[in-house]
Amino acid sequence: MDPQLPEPEPLIALIEALRRLPGVGVRSARRMAYHLLQHDLQGADMLGRALSAAVQHLRHCARCNSFTEDEVCATCANPKRDPGLLCIVETPADQNMIESSHGYRGLYYVLMGRIAPLEGVGPRELDFQRVIERACDGVVQEVILATNFTAEGETTAHFLDDALSERGLKVTRLARGVPAGSELEYVDAGTIAWALMERRST
């Protein structure tokens, strides 16, 4: 049972802020707060400054929707990338995993989420119209759906497949070497590289 002792308002605010992190409950948040305040004041100050700077200076890339300091991120601005390939992922973490596989040299679009009806997240919330406009720019020749192999990821991929295929785009999906129910963030780079090479038409 959580302690019922009264806590200072700044401590309560810190705990509530830490609870916003994924997978962090009230007990974990309280432990983090105690650790920072008791054992790592310098780290607490660094964390606060880093969060403030990130919120102030980061924005979404105008082309791929990932995080950047500039209007267009370094990946989208790289002339060595293949503009005919567009890989759609759920999160920047998934984008980083695909990049670490060294099996992809195209461009990306980051959804910043996935369709999750129970959470009130649908195509409108993910701004699918912007995704479609990006894919239909006249340069993209193939769209690779690299959403996670979870129920929500599959639903997202199915919706995008229908929307993009009816517009004449070639749409492919990562091969099933990625285990069902898994998230790309936790899949090894070798498996992702194989799944990219063996991707299948939808």
Curated annotation (Swiss-Prot):
Keywords: DNA damage, DNA recombination, DNA repair, Metal-binding, Zinc, Zinc-finger. InterPro entries: DNA_Rcmb_RecR (IPR000093), Rcmb_RecR (IPR023627), Rcmb_RecR_Znf (IPR015967), TOPRIM_dom (IPR006171), TOPRIM_RecR (IPR034137). A zinc finger (C4-type) spans 61-76. Residues 84-179 form the Toprim domain. The keyword DNA repair applies. The keyword DNA repair applies. Coiled coil: none annotated. GO terms for molecular function: DNA binding; zinc ion binding. GO terms for biological process: DNA recombination; DNA repair. SUPFAM superfamilies: Recombination protein RecR. May play a role in DNA repair. It seems to be involved in an RecBC-independent recombinational process of DNA repair. It may act with RecF and RecO. Belongs to the RecR family. HAMAP family: RecR (MF_00017). PANTHER family: RECOMBINATION PROTEIN RECR. This is Recombination protein RecR. It comes from Bordetella pertussis (strain Tohama I / ATCC BAA-589 / NCTC 13251). The gene is recR.
